[in-house]
């Protein structure tokens, strides 16, 4: 099973190099993050996106912050910086876990005992570990997913939503990583990729990855999924996750919830592919997941799409009248009752219950 050749995150010469996903697929360009503030900007403005990639970028942001110092800040100053990082994208739990992992290694109780050099070294080691761990976990997750499909090479039709491939992770992917691994196992695939309004991650990113991987695919608008399921045999819907509550309720890119409802109606298995880093056992269900509200302009215009010079590709007002108000929740929550199974690096959870989730992650 091969990893993707796409590398959205590179650590080179103590600088973080990020593939600028705002300008894909028209332009392939990279930006260099030299400070924590650069990383916060990259996360908030979606230069980098996808819960695992956000967390890894955040970890390297912490490294860049420490590398910029000539003396240790007070612990209160450090907490403020970490808080600013956390606020850049609040829904995905992965970023919070990365910050907490750093904090657990250098806790307030014995913060004074660590030298600046020790923390600089430890921060970089953690970020590099997270980069390699995510790739390994994605590959393992994909191996487990193969058991859900025929052992013999078959023709499979799959629907996916948003972007969950190499661009969203350390380099293989969760849901799209599963699709890639099914192809590598000899299956003949046809993938229907939701365009994923309003930010068009499916149209701009997933479609691009599928073409790069030479996987047969069709781009569909989000509201075509019902037509696709009713007009041809669909073997599975596979999506990713930004946060999974204790009971299995799953926050993912807006539009996932209605896709799950349509899949349930048509008897199509609906799978979530995610690693343990997307689990949040501190919350009982999806109602506790904070939903990020983004700018209205992402709904009312395509001005957020930039060319290689950073200029808007289209003028404001081409989609909706100027002054029209819009709602723009970036995520919705799919109830566990609509999810056939959650594919993880520890195995497959099905049926999706709190007890089964805790068992597979050895919490009970």
UniProtKB/Swiss-Prot annotation:
Q: Tell me the pathway.
A: Amino-acid biosynthesis; L-methionine biosynthesis via salvage pathway; L-methionine from S-methyl-5-thio-alpha-D-ribose 1-phosphate: step 1/6
Please name the GO terms that the record assigns under molecular function. S-methyl-5-thioribose-1-phosphate isomerase activity
**InterPro entries under this entry?**
IF-2B-related (IPR000649), IF-M1Pi (IPR005251), IF_2B-like_C (IPR042529), Initiation_fac_2B_a/b/d (IPR011559), M1Pi_N (IPR027363), NagB/RpiA_transferase-like (IPR037171)
Query: What EC number(s) does its UniProt record assign?
Result: 5.3.1.23
Q: Which GO terms describe its biological process?
A: L-methionine salvage from methylthioadenosine
**Per the record, a Pfam family?**
IF-2B
Quote the record's binding site residues for substrate: 49-51, 89, 201, 252-253
Q: Which SUPFAM superfamilies match?
A: NagB/RpiA/CoA transferase-like (SSF100950)
Query: What keywords are assigned to this protein?
Result: Amino-acid biosynthesis, Isomerase, Methionine biosynthesis
The entry's active site is 242
Enumerate the residues marked as the site Transition state stabilizer. Answer: 162
* Reactions catalysed: 5-(methylsulfanyl)-alpha-D-ribose 1-phosphate = 5-(methylsulfanyl)-D-ribulose 1-phosphate
Instruction: State the family named in the UniProt similarity comment for this chain.
Output: Belongs to the eIF-2B alpha/beta/delta subunits family. MtnA subfamily.
Q: What does this protein do?
A: Catalyzes the interconversion of methylthioribose-1-phosphate (MTR-1-P) into methylthioribulose-1-phosphate (MTRu-1-P).
NCBIfam families per record: eIF-2B_rel, PRK05720.1, salvage_mtnA
What name does UniProt use for this protein?
Answer: Methylthioribose-1-phosphate isomerase
Q: Which organism is it from?
A: Leptospira interrogans serogroup Icterohaemorrhagiae serovar Lai (strain 56601)
What phylogenetic lineage does the species belong to? Answer: Bacteria, Pseudomonadati, Spirochaetota, Spirochaetia, Leptospirales
